[in-house]
Amino acid sequence: MDLDLLIGIFPQVLLDGLTLGFMYALIALGYTMVYGVLEFINFAHSEIFIIGAFVGVEILLSFKSAGWLDVIPWVLVLFIVLIAGMAVSGAVAVVIERTAYRPLRSAPRLIPLISAIGVSFFLQDAIRLFESLWRNSFNLVYPTMDVLNHRFELTETIDVSVKSLVVIVAALLMLWSLHTL
């Protein structure tokens, strides 16, 4: 491979690596906060977020089928989708904590860990079952909001997507607020 080519793509690879690193930071932040409160690692942490994402996608699909995506401003649609996803994720997390984790707080440390792995498997299969029954296909192409797919060209060889900017800004804000508050 040519050295000039490597030097030319290095800034883009660096930006993509930083974005991925900030995604890992968000995941680690979530695990750390859950561990700090519950004092065990919740392996169902990501599945709870996936439920929120699927709720958002289902709302987005409902808006699309009703023709509302052309009428309602995208900022309002995004706000509705995010609030609904967060509300459902929060409710699912509370139910899981009260039914699967709280009764095991005084048990040996391995028992809640096994429970967390079981909850993770249960939620994965429940999501898979719901989506396959509801949509007849788990691998369905979902509509996206054009604003999230937009890319800003910084130079000829470097561009950044709105999704990457959202991840970076969210991670920086959350890490800063955790550090200072």
What are these language model-derived features?
Residues 1-38, 44-181:
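Small-residue-rich transmembrane alpha-helical segments that form helix-helix packing/gating elements
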